[in-house]
């Protein structure tokens, strides 16, 4: 998981990210977009889930213009008592031994056929 998440064939904007106050705001936004998706042509891209890197709670949507935007919030507090972890996005490994590979700790799987495609460019 690395270059597969980039826009294919040409440079461009992958997505815009908005930091929310807390997990409640991420889920509230998810519910609102879910309710309005037919009326305003929103499309769920990926989420709700938790990223390995940074541990943010995330939710990705396509706007009516097909650009991808992310709502995310900090998922934890790290200090020197938390051991360092290693994640290799190129080899698609990370997390705890025995975990299924992928770019998130939990949540639905990412659709690599559509994530980062040219619809919103």
State what each model feature region is:
Residues 18-69, 73-80, 85-121:
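Vicinal oxygen chelate
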Residues 1-7:
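Short, small-residue-biased leader/transition segments that mark boundaries at the very start
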Residues 10:
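Long C-terminal interaction/binding lobes of large macromolecular proteins
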